[in-house]
Amino acid sequence: MDVNPTLLFLKVPAQNAISTTFPYTGDPPYSHGTGTGYTMDTVNRTHQYSERGRWTTNTETGAPQLNPIDGPLPEDNEPSGYAQTDCVLEAMAFLEESHPGIFENSCIETMEVVQQTRVDKLTQGRQTYDWTLNRNQPAATALANTIEVFRSNGLTANESGRLIDFLKDVMESMNKEEMEITTHFQRKRRVRDNMTKKMVTQRTIGKRKQKLNKRSYLIRALTLNTMTKDAERGKLKRRAIATPGMQIRGFVYFVETLARSICEKLEQSGLPVGGNEKKAKLANVVRKMMTNSQDTELSFTITGDNTKWNENQNPRMFLAMITYMTRNQPEWFRNVLSIAPIMFSNKMARLGKGYMFESKSMKLRTQIPAEMLASIDLKYFNGSTRKKIEKIRPLLIEGTASLSPGMMMGMFNMLSTVLGVSILNLGQKRYTKTTYWWDGLQSSDDFALIVNAPNHEGIQAGVDRFYRTCKLLGINMSKKKSYINRTGTFEFTSFFYRYGFVANFSMELPSFGVSGINESADMSIGVTVIKNNMINNDLGPATAQMALQLFIKDYRYTYRCHRGDTQIQTRRSFEIKKLWEQTRSKAGLLVSDGGPNLYNIRNLHIPEVCLKWELMDEDYQGRLCNPLNPFVSHKEIESMNNAVMMPAHGPAKNMEYDAVATTHSWIPKRNRSILNTSQRGILEDEQMYQRCCNLFEXFFPSSSYRRPVGISSMVEAMVSRAQIDARIDFESGRIKKEEFTEIMKICSTIEELRRQK
């Protein structure tokens, strides 16, 4: 379809067209191969930014460490990580002066959270470095493996189920002389297949015990595994991201809880709120600066960009901040919070998979694992890789690189925001003591700075002072990438402000379309996305109507469920036509059963089953919503489900959609081939977990067992429930005395077994 693009813009104000320049249609770029090179880049760059710091050696692991704190003040505009402790502490003190009691109150809130948080908090999250297997696993599995190893090594505080007790075990584990772990390994052998008489490779999974000495265990506990960040748009080069292990995660969570609590109280912080709430917060700051810049004052805004925010931050600085913020708090609390930054200043970066070599002439491929990079002859590598390896070699231990300075991506978003806001806070006239003053917004590494002054020289002086203040705290504003405008036009975290926020619709484009979960969820998510964009993103009625028609078309092609009276032939058309002919009320058929689409922009909030219920034939209703239908493995459905939406950039968003259980809410069955891999153990654990949950549900039919509260275990809860129920049933005559006695006997046997365990 040829569209003359200029026609699109005839009636559109220029600022609304900004979103069409974004690279957000089509598939985002994904990375292939190993992330080893990107990780080495990160490690080398981080050390380069701090190169004039002091070198020391970690006494426990022998890792060389670079400490740039209180290092030489920069003399040029190159990025550097030499934060000055006294400056950071002073910035914190001024932040507290402007917000009396902010740290105190946040500490009290955090202490409550620390005492209540369950260890299952750590099961949230995707891939996690599993130190027992030395590779990534889903968070829940990694946690289960860690706890299993802890218990077999005599660390049992975690059995209370509280996160803080699990962390006590982590601390304890670091003092042990050795830790015994169970690792999985694959045996391959060539055997002759009886049927085909061909030779085949048979894989079996073995488990074996392995002892780690204190040094090896510490290295693993302090390791961050690295991967390549996928699906980043608008970038030529990929970059590495880190995933920490279970030892670090709990401590980071508590630090971020404190920092989040502080950010909520700071008007300049763009975190932890999002969406419309964030826009309102930002608009307030802008309004304040505009109204206070009287007719005599000029007001300018910088759309800011910081160079390599993470790589110039320093965990030692975070330790100083935490020490200051918690200074009047109980000793145990200060200790818990200071462990995360201490672990990060001793962190090790795992270099990933290593390099793949292939010889074209001999048709050979071989993998050089990261562990070998320390000793392999460099003649096999090209020039740039050779330089990287030479540079990183002094830092290598057991295939990981010592990385003391810098923070890996996304670890301390909240805490680093507090640091950024503390500089914005210094812009008040009572601190600048001159005619210029500033304010702004900070969200992790993104910032917008609003400077007011009587004349242009004042604006320039204000920006310079801000720039130099940032340098003292290890923040490097990029002079190349930041730009300044009259206040009223700027961009912050992909929100475009032009006398108010302009909808950046292109960011939402990737979430339109069919998600591919199942017929029921996809229909629901599809219409919800359109509805949400009408509410939040200026999606007009005509465009929404068109989006809806395109979505239905896309949906029908995806699930091959064209209307029963169509001419289109697909694999499903025979069944769909048959159903169409048998159905009296054709409007009642779901779109996924070849029915017509009854959605329009007025009824997007109603689930399709509800929309068509009154129009359905009775036997169709019975088949559609029958939990006993043998052809469906049913998902237990809550009234709301969550879909993970990937906006064009920024973190994945959770989107709620209505979930009505029908025979279309199927879950795809697991692929058999998983049973032959090292993941098999995980599968068995999952099934075990599933059986336990089913059993638990039989005792507590209405339960949602995801978050057990209180310290008693599932077994204790079931036993006491059985005893109570049995007594009630016996007293009301529903069961006989013999049955009652038998139940009580079984219960006491279980309790006895628990005690012996």
Curated annotation (Swiss-Prot):
Its EC number is 2.7.7.48. Keywords: Eukaryotic host gene expression shutoff by virus, Eukaryotic host transcription shutoff by virus, Host cytoplasm, Host gene expression shutoff by virus, Host nucleus, Host-virus interaction, Inhibition of host RNA polymerase II by virus, Nucleotide-binding, Nucleotidyltransferase, Phosphoprotein, RNA-directed RNA polymerase, Transferase, Viral RNA replication, Viral transcription. Residues 55-64 have a biased composition (Polar residues). Residues 53-82 are annotated as: Disordered. It catalyses: RNA(n) + a ribonucleoside 5'-triphosphate = RNA(n+1) + diphosphate. A motif (Nuclear localization signal) lies at residues 187-195, 203-216. Phosphorylated by host PRKCA. GO terms for cellular component: host cell cytoplasm; host cell nucleus. Residues 286-483 form the RdRp catalytic domain. Residues 249-256 are annotated as: Promoter-binding site. GO terms for biological process: DNA-templated transcription; symbiont-mediated suppression of host gene expression; symbiont-mediated suppression of host mRNA transcription via inhibition of RNA polymerase II activity; viral RNA genome replication; viral transcription. It is found in: Host nucleus; Host cytoplasm. GO terms for molecular function: nucleotide binding; RNA binding; RNA-directed RNA polymerase activity. Transmembrane segments: none annotated. It is an enzyme of class 2 (transferase). RNA-dependent RNA polymerase which is responsible for replication and transcription of virus RNA segments. The transcription of viral mRNAs occurs by a unique mechanism called cap-snatching. 5' methylated caps of cellular mRNAs are cleaved after 10-13 nucleotides by PA. In turn, these short capped RNAs are used as primers by PB1 for transcription of viral mRNAs. During virus replication, PB1 initiates RNA synthesis and copy vRNA into complementary RNA (cRNA) which in turn serves as a template for the production of more vRNAs. Influenza RNA polymerase is composed of three subunits: PB1, PB2 and PA. Interacts (via N-terminus) with PA (via C-terminus). Interacts (via C-terminus) with PB2 (via N-terminus); this interaction is essential for transcription initiation. Interacts (via C-terminus) with human PKP2 (via N-terminus); the interaction competitively inhibits the interaction between the RNA polymerase subunits PB1 and PB2. Belongs to the influenza viruses polymerase PB1 family. This is RNA-directed RNA polymerase catalytic subunit.
